[in-house]
Amino acid sequence: MKIRNIDLGRYPIFLAPMEDVTDPAFRLMCKKFGADMVYTEFVSADALIRSVGKTMQKLNINDEERPVAIQIYGRDTETMVEAAKIVEEAHPDILDINFGCPVKRVAGKGAGAGMLQNIPLMLEITRAVVDTVKIPVTVKTRLGWDNEHKIIVDLAEQLQDCGIEALTIHGRTRAQMYTGEADWSLIGKVKKNPRMHIPIIGNGDITTPQRAKECFDLYGVDAIMIGRASFGRPWIFKEIKHYIETGKELPALSFEWRLNVLRQEVLDSVNLLDERRGILHVRRHLAASPLFKGIPNFKETRIAMLRAETVKELFSILDYIRGNYGMNC
């Protein structure tokens, strides 16, 4: 699969853009375990043109994580165009437009998935951004606003006509948020549409290597995107790659090995930011990791993780888990 001149190989697997998750440390970790392309946290166009410090930091990328896409969202054409210019100066490989975020503070204001209620404006913004920058522009969106308005098949053609070079589809409507099951049949319908010639990337409910391969085989997508399943589990890319290449599950990764991966993520986050900001960011990853699923009475330990303020505190909690439960996980 290629996006313009970016060769992403066969069966590429992408790390989805996730707010407060896909910081540089996590992106590099996922890249290490096999992610073929990574995305930044989504970036507000309004905040970008106002040069808000925290937002500007989201544009920080490094060569080790390439190819990397920076994703922006907004609801005004002029603002999105100016934001696109700023993003291009950060030298990402791709600029991605978010037309899929379902949360109220974004979609409720007409941005993200809110654009699914204003297709003319969505297309206007897309054309304007494509015409503004020289790097490839891609889009991430959903099936439609609700079950009665699943418009993705026609919308995909319209977005392609605007000049985008790849389309990512999350297999839910905005109304579903993250409930119910992703409808991959509609993603497959877009891919099999003879009028579509850009790469189609599927996203939604890919939590196992078996499901990843099934999505390639059954629906013919050019790539898959992993979101929430990578949260606290960056090695999922390694597991999927191994299964696709061999048809066999990766030999079980030891609890100790996986715990050390999380330790390294803590150190990487602190080194890239500072201890206060790094811990604030990474402690949520640890608390949500499926590595700790099944540990009895884990609620209090999770709360302690979420309250930790130093590397020493977090490592002390991980040492406690290892000493008390490591042999049983």
Region locations from a protein language model:
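Hydrophobic faces of well-ordered beta-strands that scaffold small-molecule active sites
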Residues: 13-16, 38-40, 68-72, 95, ...
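Alpha/beta enzyme core
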Residues: 32, 81-111, 120-198, 214
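Glycine-rich, positively charged N-terminal anion/phosphate-binding segment
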Residues: 1-4, 9, 18-93
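Aromatic- and acidic-residue-enriched carbohydrate-binding clefts of CAZyme catalytic domains
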Residues: 116
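Alpha/beta catalytic cores of nucleotide-metabolism and tRNA/nucleoside-modifying enzymes
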Residues: 1-9, 13, 19, 24-25, ...
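Short glycine-enriched loop/turn motifs at secondary-structure junctions
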Residues: 63-66, 108, 299
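Active-site beta-loop-alpha junctions enriched in small/polar residues
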Residues: 18-20, 43-45, 73-75, 100-102, ...
